[in-house]
Structures are given as structure tokens and as C-alpha cells.
């Protein structure tokens, strides 16, 4: 016998590291090493070994015929590796012939251009290649890496499926194997003639099995054709599962039509590896007729079944060392309570259904089914102890996230780790599963918009965690999402506190919209997969039929390699709000499926109707989108543009609509509410006047003094002048003569001419009384308007005295110019700035939060509160979205009060008197006093409840819309 010497015409070259052995005694370990690598065996007496070898192969591959399961198919062959010299021996069982063009798993070493050594070792184990020559006969014994039974990959997969059969035999499961073949010069995955199992009670699974046999999926790395679910798993070497295959797009799951017809729902696919090798040998697929969110039992069962036959699926091969985890855990677990407390606060204040904390798996010491040596350092997963789930339905999504780890770059969380930016997705369910792997689970849980925020280490600025906030399920409107995004960003800026972590306020924010990848697939993939016939991708023009759509402009800009930004502009003294916009997760081209794409973009089309501007900027090679303008030409960076209508809407025009709601006024003027709010801010109006005030205890004179104290007002503003255009309304308590109700919208062009100029308001009636968008009554006597504040106050006082039996509430308009504190840094909730390029940070001149001193009040609506309970005192921020109940909870939490009900809250008013705070109306009045007095802090005292309780608040109506 000689080892390691090539010769003859054999197809395989032996290992030639060892020379010819001498006749001396050899070390047995060295001999084992030699045989382990393979060797040639040669005879010199001319005796043929064909018959002997055929018998050996047949004996080694014979199956046990006692296992007669008509729904479990496995095929064992002694392969004809050298057609000129070896006859094909069948095993003891008879099987249908394999059609020409389909190669068997044992032929992989010759036909599939993967890792030849690894494939040969698994597929050629215990197989022999013979050569004949005049001098004798020789044959090659291939190396055997497996320490398990002498069997092929297919044999072992059959055994593994038999083991799975015991676990799922009574369930509605179809288990099938996909193995690689070569056809027409391309590599494919096929399940035809491969092992499979299904429960015969479910005829739909039998039909779906027949459908799957007709499909071949490409297994080439550089293919642009649809690879399907098995192909993705095979190429990426990562498992993939979905709760419902109907959520796939047709290019992601070409069998989707047949799956719907066969009532197929859940699907799980795992790659199969030889133990100790990184070469993927095939894919195990499980489908079921039920919708499944949790596949952990099936994952564990498949992994155990594969390990029992010396195969494996994905797993972590190199977990972090114990020393690393011990050092990191000191930092890691110290930060979790801080993160959890902050997420709890945010979820309670904004009514979020879910808030997740993500961290690298390596730093958690967490293992998962998607791990490998190559990606373990890039894998991230949820920190379950730091996830807040107020919504019960969202708990299933948390379980899915804990089970399905993400790689850096996948989803907005993976991108936040990778790019160190804030990422916002208006609708997560519109993304493909490749771009957002948890999109299907989010759809079942009813989740939509999400924001990913990276948390950095204060010492080295590395990203330690990523927080993922899911917006309320009802927050679907673009404007509502914008308001929520700004308000939530203000909270992130102002209220996050940690010893070791911080949120970088100079980060950019990217708003990500879905864009399809260009893929090609055939209706009959078995016929056309190799030729590519009748597979034409839809052109870009078919994706969006309307050239005016800002989505189509954005897509075209992205296709040309241009950056795209989304901006909301405010007044000149405020920084421009600008959001980075990416049209997908990578730079893939846009392809087929225009109908579905349009449906995904419908939610953003509303913005166009509100006056969204699109600017193609040649200097930046970017598209800028802003509120309030139509399609314009290029402009230089930093320039501001306004529509003619917006420029010409003055204070006189606004006054005509103060009696009604802000939304009605916006509709009448012809702008969206957001634009109207901005116009009001330009005129110094920070809150729409027609809101409901609950108490009459403060005179209009005090309000007039506040208004007069504001610098920069052009001309004197009198309170009674705001209501001269109120509609007439008859009242038995009023002395007015008019009895008809006149609609202020009856003015020409709603108070604005066709050219956008203000129409002259009608002369005011001598006396009028009106109900303003609620139950509050507003009165004015404008026959002889006076600029004297005392006259206005006396007039209202006289009316109140004459109508003591009527319910009369104080009417007041808060008019403050935005020039107050111009030099002070604007709050994030109003001036959040997101720039397209790195030189424009997320926050222009971002406010730094001092570590050991209280922060200045910002202009975003948040209020400082100082609460006292006995000798204890605390300070905190009253967010603009809080109500009385949230204030109670925060005070109870700060003072560790289990039940706040037995306690009374009192606030210090402008007369230095303690007034009970019992409801929303009282809280609103408290905030009004705080703002009117220019006080920096709201003072609240907590007392034990008194025996005598006062009656309910007079007219509890909520605050008007905040500007």
C-alpha cells in the first residue's frame, strides 16, 4: 500500500504530504492521521476489486426495511463516480429513477463549485474511486471527517427527519429537505426526490409538497433572480422564519400564491452544515397551516436532531470569555436600571405600546440560532430585562425579537448600531423581510412607526445600546407622527440621565422609506429558472404614475445617486428642521411590484396635499422637502422660501378666525394646521386664542399687562379687538338686538382673496355673544372700541354683574411674541434640526445638560416643578403632554407614595395663596398662572387629604391646541 502518491488518470489527487513508507514498524497514531486524510490502495497481482468494492458499498448503505413510513422518503445509492469502471449498485429498496439533469448529493464534489475538500469529505465518505492499469488495480479511499456512522449526508438527514417525526407526527407540519444540484451551468436548490415528511391528515400539506417539488431556487451568490426562502437561507447560512408567509412579497416568496391556496401560514428554514465545517450542505424547511410567532421549540428540536447525526445548524462557535463578561457586566448591569426607568417614563407619558433595549450578543454572553463565527461580533439582541411592554398584544413581538437576533445593518436597530445615527421608520410593515427581518411580526402585533436611538458610552463614545420606540398604534397620520417625533426627541434630549451613557445630540436623523430591490422570477421557475425567459423587471416609471408625487421624485433622486432630505421649516430665527431620508437599506436598484409600492407610499402622500415642497438642489445634489410650498427650482443652502399665501396672511386675517378652532381656521384659510401654527408663531401667537379657560378669578387687566410687557409688538394689541368679528348669537341674557347666527366663513374667499391678500373684515356688530368650539361663552361689546385696558375690564365686569345667573367664563388670548429670549437656545421639541450632511448636526448649537445644576427652561412648553412633601423637596419637569393623572403619578413616584389618592395637591398662585389642584382644569389654570407671571417654577405642595372636599371644578374642558 502507498499513501499520498498521485498517478494514473484518477479524478482526485491524494494528499502527497507523506512519502513512501518503509517496512519498519509505524506509529499507529501516524497511521490514523494518514488514513484520516485519505489514501490509495493498490494491488499488484492483477486481481480486480470491482466486485469486492461493490459488495462493500452495498453493505454499508443498506437501510432497515422495517421502517415502513409511506410518507418518509429517503434514497441511498452507491454512486457511479467513475462511469467507465464502477457499476451502480442499488440498495435493498427500490426507488423511482432520478430524472436526467438532477444530480444526487454524492455528486457534489464533482459538480458543485463550493468548498471541494469539505464537500468531498462529507459526500464521499467511505466511497471509493477505482483505477485500472496494466500493472494492477488501485482505488482511492476518501478522507472521513465525520466521527459518526458511515453514511452520506442524505442518509443522515433521513435519520434526522425520523427523529423529528416523533416530535411533530401529530401536528400540521411539512418537513422537507432542499439540496444543491447543478443544471445548465447554474447551481440550484431542489426538494425533488429528497427526504420529506408530512402528516397525512392534512391534505393541503400534501398539495403544497407537490407544489414545492416543481420549484428550483438559485444558489449562486451573484444571481439577481429570485432565490426564494430556501435560497436565502442557503446563501446567507442563516435561519429564517415568519409567522405567516402571506406577508411576503412575491419576489421574496415565489410560492406565495400556492401557499395561499394550500392554506400554508408559518414557515421555518434552517441551513445544514457538516459538524466542524462552514460549508452549507442543504436546507431543512418546515411549514405549517397555523400562524406561529414562536419557533423556539422547533429550532431546538431540529438542532438536536441534526447533532445526533453529526450535522449542525447555525450557532455561536466562539462565545465571549468569562473574564470579558465579568468586566463588562459591571458596566452593563449598572446601566440597565437607568435605561429601564427612562423607558418606563417615556411609555407612560406618550402612551407607547412598546420600548425595546438592544445590545450586542457578545457583550451579553447571549447565544442564538443566527450566530456563527463570522457574524457573532455583529449580532445584536434585546435585553429583555430592560424592555417595557405596556401593550399586551406587543408581548408577542418582544418574544420574537428576543428569539430573532439582528445583524448590524439589519433593520433600523442594526443600522443605528452600524451608522451611529437616529433612524425613523413611518411604517415598518411596508418593508421587505430582508430589509426589516421583524416586519412580519410587527404586522401581526399591529405596530407601525418606530424610532431607533443609539446610547453611547461616555468614556469612549462607542454605542452600547440602541433604544427602539414604537409609536402609538393610532399614530398613523404624517402630521401626528411628526409631532410625536419632535416631542419624543425633546424628552430624549432633556430627561435621559445616566452615569455612563448619553444620547449624542449631534447625531443625524434618517427617515427611511421602503424601496424594492430589483429581482426577477418566473411563474414556472422549474422551466424558466435556467433561461431567464419571460422575466422582465418593471421599469421605474411604472412604480409611480404621478410625476407630481414627492415619493416619485425622491425615488428618482435616489436612483441617480443623490442624497434626499426631508425638511420642515419654521420662522427665520429658528433653525430649519431637516430630516435625512434614505430610500432603502442599501443602494439596490428599484424593481418590480409597482402596485404594492404605491400602496406603501399612500400614507406619505397626505403630506403632498398639505403643501409639501420638493427642491432639487444642484449644489448639494439632494432633494429637499419642506412644508408649505410647491415644486420649486434649485436654491442655495440656508435660503428660506415662503409661498405667497403664507407671506400675506397677516394678524388681521387671523383675528377673523379666533372664535373658531384652529383646524377650522386652517381649512378656511386654505392651509394645513401645521402651517397655520407656524404663521401664528411668526405673529407672536404661541397658543390659539379660542381655548377654554376654567376660572374667572383673574382679570383681563392682568392679561393686558402681560401683553403690553412683550417687546417687539407692532402697535397696541387690545383683547377686545380679537373678538369683534365673532358671529352674532341671540341670548336671553344679552341686550343685543340681533337674533341670527352668521357664519364668519361667509366672507369673500374665506377672508383671503384669490391673490392671497387679506379681505377687509366686516364691521363688528354692536353686541355679540358666541360659543367658541366648545361650551365656553365669549362676549364682546365692540360698538365703540377703546384702546384703554381699563375700559375693556370695566365693560366685561359690567356684563358679568348684569348677567350673574349666566355661566360666564373668562376669555383671554395669550399673545406673546417669539422674540422673547431669542438668544436662548431653542428647545428640541420646537427646533429639532436634522441635517443631511455631517457638517450640519442634528441640533444646531445643541444645549448641553449640566451635570450638577438645573437646566434652563426651554421654549418648547415643558415646565419646571418644585414639589414639597413635609420636609422633602423634589424638582422635575412637567412635560407638555402630561395631564393631571401623569402629574399625580410622577409626584407619587418621586416621594415613594404607594397610593396618592389620600393626598391633596396644592399649587402656589400669583396671589401667594395655596390653591387645590384636583383635576385637569385646575392643572391648566395652574400652568396659565405660571406662564402669565413669568415664574420659572411651579410650586406644588402635597398634604394629607382634608375632611371637607370641595366640589368639582367649574367647567372642566381641556387645553386648546398648542402651537
Curated annotation (Swiss-Prot):
Regions of compositional bias (Low complexity) in chain numbering: 756-794
Disordered: annotated span: 734-794
Stated role: Probable transcription factor.
Entry protein name: Protein NLP2
Main location: nucleus
Cellular component per GO, a single term: nucleus
PROSITE patterns membership: PB1, RWP_RK
Organism expressing this protein natively: Arabidopsis thaliana (Mouse-ear cress)
Cross-referenced PANTHER family: PROTEIN NLP2 (PTHR32002:SF46), PROTEIN NLP8 (PTHR32002)
Gene Ontology process terms (BP): regulation of DNA-templated transcription
UniProt-annotated location(s): Nucleus
Coiled coil: none
Residues in PB1 domain copies: 862-945
UniProt keyword Magnesium, yes or no: no
SMART domains: PB1
Amino acid at each position: 500500500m502507498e499513501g499520498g502518491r498521485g498517478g494514473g488518470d484518477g479524478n482526485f489527487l491524494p494528499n502527497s504530504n507523506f512519502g513512501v513508507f518503509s517496512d519498519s514498524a509505524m506509529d499507529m497514531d501516524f497511521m490514523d492521521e494518514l488514513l484520516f486524510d485519505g489514501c490509495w490502495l493498490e494491488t499488484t497481482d492483477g486481481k480486480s476489486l470491482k466486485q469486492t468494492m461493490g459488495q462493500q458499498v452495498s453493505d454499508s448503505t443498506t437501510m432497515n426495511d422495517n421502517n415502513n413510513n409511506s410518507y418518509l422518503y429517503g434514497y441511498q445509492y452507491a454512486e457511479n463516480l467513475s462511469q467507465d469502471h464502477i457499476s451502480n449498485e442499488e440498495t435493498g429498496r427500490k426507488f423511482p429513477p432520478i430524472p436526467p439533469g438532477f444530480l444526487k448529493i454524492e455528486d457534489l464534489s464533482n459538480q458543485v463549485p463550493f468548498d471541494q475538500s469539505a464537500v468531498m469529505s462529507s459526500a464521499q465518505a467511505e466511497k471509493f474511486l477505482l483505477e485500472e492499469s496494466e500493472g494492477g488495480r488501485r482505488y482511492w479511499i476518501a478522507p472521513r471527517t465525520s466521527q459518526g456512522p458511515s453514511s452520506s449526508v442524505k442518509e443522515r438527514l433521513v435519520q434526522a427527519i425520523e427523529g423529528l417525526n416523533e416530535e411533530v407526527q401529530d401536528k400540521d407540519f411539512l418537513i422537507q429537505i432542499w439540496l444543491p444540484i447543478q443544471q445548465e451551468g447554474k447551481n440550484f436548490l431542489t426538494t425533488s426526490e429528497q427526504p420529506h415528511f408530512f402528516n397525512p391528515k392534512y391534505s393541503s400539506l400534501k398539495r403544497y409538497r407537490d407544489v414545492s417539488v416543481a420549484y428550483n431556487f438559485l444558489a449562486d451568490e451573484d444571481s439577481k433572480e429570485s432565490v426564494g426562502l430556501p435560497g436565502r437561507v442557503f446563501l446567507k447560512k442563516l435561519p429564517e422564519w415568519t409567522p405567516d408567509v402571506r406577508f411576503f412579497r412575491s419576489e421574496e416568496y415565489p410560492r406565495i400564491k400556492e401557499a395561499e391556496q394550500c392554506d400554508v401560514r408559518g414557515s421555518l428554514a434552517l441551513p445544514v452544515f457538516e459538524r466542524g465545517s462552514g460549508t452549507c450542505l442543504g436546507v431543512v424547511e418546515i411549514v405549517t397551516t397555523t400562524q406561529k410567532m414562536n419557533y423556539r421549540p422547533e429550532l431546538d428540536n431540529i438542532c438536536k436532531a441534526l447533532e445526533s447525526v453529526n450535522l449542525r445548524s447555525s450557532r455561536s462557535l466562539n462565545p465571549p470569555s468569562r473574564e470579558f463578561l465579568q468586566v463588562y457586566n459591571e458596566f452593563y448591569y449598572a446601566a440597565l436600571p437607568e435605561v429601564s426607568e427612562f423607558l418606563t417614563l417615556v411609555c407612560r407619558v406618550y402612551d407607547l405600546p412598546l420600548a425595546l433595549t438592544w445590545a450586542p450578543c457578545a457583550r451579553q454572553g447571549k447565544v442564538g440560532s443566527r450566530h456563527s463565527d463570522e457574524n457573532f461580533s455583529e449580532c445584536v439582541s434585546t435585553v429583555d430585562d430592560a424592555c417595557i411592554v405596556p401593550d399586551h398584544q406587543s408581548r408577542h413581538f418582544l418574544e420574537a425579537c428576543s428569539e430573532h437576533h439582528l445583524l448590524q445593518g439589519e433593520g433600523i436597530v442594526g443600522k443605528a448600531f452600524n451608522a451611529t445615527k437616529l433612524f425613523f421608520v413611518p411604517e415598518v410593515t411596508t418593508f421587505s423581510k430582508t430589509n426589516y427581518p421583524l416586519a412580519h411580526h410587527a404586522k401581526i402585533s399591529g405596530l407601525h412607526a418606530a424610532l431607533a436611538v443609539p446610547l453611547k458610552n461616555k468614556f469612549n463614545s462607542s454605542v452600547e445600546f440602541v433604544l427602539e420606540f414604537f409609536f402609538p398604534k393610532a399614530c398613523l397620520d404624517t402630521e401626528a407622527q411628526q409631532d410625536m417625533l419632535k416631542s419624543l426627541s425633546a424628552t430624549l434630549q432633556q430627561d435621559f440621565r445616566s452615569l455612563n451613557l448619553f444620547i449624542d445630540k449631534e447625531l443625524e436623523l434618517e427617515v427611511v422609506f421602503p424601496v424594492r430591490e430589483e429581482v426577477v422570477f418566473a411563474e414556472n421557475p422549474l422551466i424558466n429558472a435556467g433561461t431567464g425567459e419571460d422575466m422582465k423587471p418593471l421599469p421605474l416609471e411604472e412604480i409611480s404614475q404621478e410625476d407630481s408625487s414627492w415619493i416619485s421624485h425622491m425615488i428618482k433622486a435616489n436612483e441617480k445617486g443623490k442624497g434626499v432630505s426631508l425638511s420642515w421649516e419654521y420662522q427665520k430665527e429658528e433653525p430649519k428642521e431637516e430630516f435625512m431620508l434614505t430610500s432603502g437599506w442599501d443602494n439596490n436598484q428599484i424593481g418590480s411590484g409597482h402596485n404594492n409600492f404605491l400602496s406603501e407610499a399612500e400614507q406619505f402622500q397626505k403630506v403632498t396635499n398639505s403643501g409639501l415642497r420638493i427642491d432639487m438642489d444642484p449644489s448639494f445634489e439632494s432633494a429637499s422637502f419642506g412644508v408649505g410650498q410647491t415644486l420649486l427650482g434649485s436654491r442655495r443652502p440656508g435660503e428660506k422660501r415662503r409661498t405667497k399665501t403664507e407671506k400675506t396672511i397677516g394678524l388681521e386675517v387671523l383675528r377673523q378666525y379666533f372664535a373658531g378652532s384652529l383646524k377650522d381656521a386652517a381649512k378656511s384659510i386654505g392651509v394645513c394646521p401645521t402651517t397655520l401654527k407656524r404663521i401664528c408663531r411668526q405673529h407672536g401667537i404661541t397658543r390659539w386664542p379660542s381655548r377654554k379657560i376654567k376660572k374667572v378669578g383673574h382679570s383681563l387687566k392682568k392679561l393686558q399687562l402681560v401683553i403690553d410687557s412683550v417687546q417687539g409688538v407692532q402697535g397696541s394689541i387690545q383683547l377686545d379687538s380679537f373678538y369683534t368679528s365673532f358671529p352674532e348669537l341671540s341670548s336671553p341674557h344679552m341686550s343685543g338686538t340681533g337674533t341670527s347666527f352668521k357664519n364668519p366663513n361667509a366672507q369673500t374667499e374665506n377672508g383671503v382673496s384669490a391673490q392671497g391678500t387679506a379681505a377687509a373684515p366686516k364691521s363688528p356688530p354692536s353686541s355679540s355673544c358666541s360659543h367658541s368650539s366648545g361650551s365656553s361663552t365669549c362676549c364682546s361689546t365692540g360698538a365703540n372700541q377703546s384702546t384703554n385696558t381699563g375700559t375693556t375690564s370695566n365693560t366685561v365686569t359690567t356684563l358679568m354683574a348684569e348677567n350673574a345667573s349666566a355661566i360666564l367664563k373668562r376669555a383671554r388670548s395669550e399673545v406673546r411674541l417669539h422674540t422673547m429670549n431669542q438668544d436662548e437656545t431653542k428647545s428640541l421639541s420646537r427646533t429639532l434640526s436634522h441635517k443631511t450632511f455631517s457638517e450640519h448636526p442634528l441640533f444646531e448649537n445643541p444645549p448641553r445638560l449640566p451635570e450638577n445644576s438645573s437646566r434652563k427652561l426651554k421654549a418648547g412648553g415643558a415646565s419646571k416643578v418644585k414639589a414639597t412633601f413635609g420636609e422633602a423637596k423634589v424638582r422635575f419637569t412637567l412635560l407638555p403632554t402630561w395631564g393631571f393623572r401623569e402629574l399625580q403619578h410622577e409626584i407619587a413616584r418621586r416621594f415613594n407614595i404607594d397610593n396618592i389618592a389620600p393626598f391633596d395637591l396644592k399649587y402656589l398662585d400669583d396671589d401667594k395663596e395655596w390653591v387645590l389642584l384636583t383635576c385637569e382644569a385646575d392643572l391648566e389654570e395652574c400652568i396659565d398662572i405660571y406662564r402669565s407671571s413669568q415664574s420659572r417654577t411651579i410650586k406644588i405642595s402635597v398634604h394629607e387629604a382634608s375632611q371637607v372636599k370641595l366640589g368639582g371644578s367649574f367647567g372642566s374642558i381641556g387645553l386648546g391646541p398648542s402651537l
